[in-house]
């Protein structure tokens, strides 16, 4: 395996040389640097001590956790023997001290404890029952096959950080797969990315509720080809019930107008969901991440700006894409800033959204958004 060295944050990492990232014997995606940046900032803000990077590949995420956060014990796991050997090499590259290797486990004891394992992620998480403060799942595709085990491995007041890259499934391109994996009806069109993210969270909430665990969404977002969510678990049946009450369904008609309802069973056959209708962020948490991003070494130049957009985004479910609304009603497309300004003048709140550069989140009714577009003609 031919290797090259890359730098990200404070880490130096050996990665395979390959023309296409998917052809490499061990997976490494430089485009996920922003994802890893936000994860490092989140772990730094939380101060979690015991961390599991369950699907570690090159080890870049777990090594950045060890170098850049207060975490004291970091486990890096991958079932691929090539990945295990590469993680060991990368740990040696970034940390002094003797790495003790025995079979499919390597341990480095020092100021930080690093544990590298070559194991099936589900088996490892089931064996380490309620051991970790922070469990990170960053799979290729859907995280659902790992979720039950992750909920066993994390402490009952711990944090799950979960990535899903099966956006085609969650966004309705593969409806049957969404029904199978997430037990939810997806939606196509301009709302698919936010609905897909909320379907993912809604499924996680239902899984957690089986173990009498409630969920607080610290931050959830869509970016490029993936969804990402940081979920703080809350212990107790009542907190699980409270989280379940924030599930519901989305409806959208041909005009582009949408509505949603908090209910266990939908009132109409045209429902999309069940999905999460609660907040996608804890405002104080996101503000802290944005503050930390100004002083922390980052792997992506886009991280701080993206966190600023998330920080300023209005916390309401779903949005109106001005291009889609204009197209449906035979109107000319106008600048988003103009629509936002008109809504503000009428006393409504309105902001840009990270889900689309041509969309806005607002507490204004659909008719007011449509009227604002007409005023700009």
From Swiss-Prot:
Q: Respond yes or no to whether keyword Disulfide bond is given for this record.
A: no
Which reaction(s) are listed as its catalytic activity? guanosine(26) in tRNA + 2 S-adenosyl-L-methionine = N(2)-dimethylguanosine(26) in tRNA + 2 S-adenosyl-L-homocysteine + 2 H(+)
Is Repeat set as a keyword in this record?
no
Q: Which residues form the Trm1 methyltransferase domain?
A: 4-373
| Enzyme Commission designation | 2.1.1.216
Family annotation (SUPFAM superfamilies): S-adenosyl-L-methionine-dependent methyltransferases (SSF53335)
InterPro entries per the record?
SAM-dependent_MTases_sf (IPR029063), Trm1 (IPR002905), TRM1_arc_bac (IPR022923), tRNA_met_Trm1_C (IPR042296)
Stated role: Dimethylates a single guanine residue at position 26 of a number of tRNAs using S-adenosyl-L-methionine as donor of the methyl groups.
Q: Which PANTHER family match?
A: N 2 ,N 2 -DIMETHYLGUANOSINE TRNA METHYLTRANSFERASE, TRNA (GUANINE(26)-N(2))-DIMETHYLTRANSFERASE
Question: Would you tell me the protein name for this molecule?
Answer: tRNA (guanine(26)-N(2))-dimethyltransferase
Q: Which organism is it from?
A: Thermococcus onnurineus (strain NA1)
Identify the coding gene: trm1
């Amino acid at each position: 395996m031919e290797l090259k060295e890359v730098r990200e944050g404070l880490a130096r990492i050996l990665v395979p040389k390959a023309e296409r990232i998917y052809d490499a014997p061990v997976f490494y995606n430089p485009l996920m640097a922003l994802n890893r940046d936000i994860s490092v900032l989140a772990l730094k803000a939380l101060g979690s001590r015991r961390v599991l990077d369950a699907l570690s590949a090159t080890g870049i995420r777990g090594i950045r956790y060890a170098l850049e956060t207060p975490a004291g014990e970091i486990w890096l796991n991958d079932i691929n023997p090539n990945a295990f050997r590469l993680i060991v090499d990368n740990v040696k590259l970034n940390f002094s001290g003797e790495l003790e290797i025995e079979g499919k486990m390597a341990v480095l004891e020092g100021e930080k404890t690093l544990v590298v394992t070559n194991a099936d992620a589900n088996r490892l998480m089931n064996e380490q029952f309620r051991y970790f403060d922070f469990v990170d799942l960053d799979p290729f595709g859907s995280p659902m096959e790992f979720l039950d085990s992750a909920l066993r491995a994390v402490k009952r007041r711990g944090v799950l950080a979960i990535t899903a890259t099966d956006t085609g499934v969650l966004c309705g391109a593969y409806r049957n797969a969404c029904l199978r994996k997430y037990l939810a009806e997806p939606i196509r069109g301009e709302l698919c990315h936010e609905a897909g993210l909320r379907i993912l969270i809604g499924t996680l909430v239902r899984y957690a509720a089986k173990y009498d665990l409630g969920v607080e969404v610290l931050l959830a977002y869509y970016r490029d080809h993936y969804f990402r969510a940081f979920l703080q678990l809350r212990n107790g049946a009542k907190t699980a019930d409270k989280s379940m009450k924030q599930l519901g369904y989305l409806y959208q008609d041909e005009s582009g107008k949408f509505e949603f309802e908090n209910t266990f069973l939908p009132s109409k056959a045209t429902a999309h969901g069940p999905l999460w209708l609660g907040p996608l962020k804890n405002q104080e948490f996101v503000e802290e991440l944005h503050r930390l991003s100004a002083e922390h070494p980052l792997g992506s130049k886009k991280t701080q700006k993206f966190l600023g957009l998330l920080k300023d985004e209005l916390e309401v479910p779903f949005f109106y894409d001005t291009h889609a609304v204009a197209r449906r009603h035979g109107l000319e497309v106008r600048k988003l800033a103009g629509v936002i300004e008109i809504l503000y003048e009428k006393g409504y709140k309105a902001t840009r959204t990270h889900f689309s550069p041509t969309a806005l989140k607002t507490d204004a009714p659909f008719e007011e958004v449509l009227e604002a577009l007409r005023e700009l003609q």
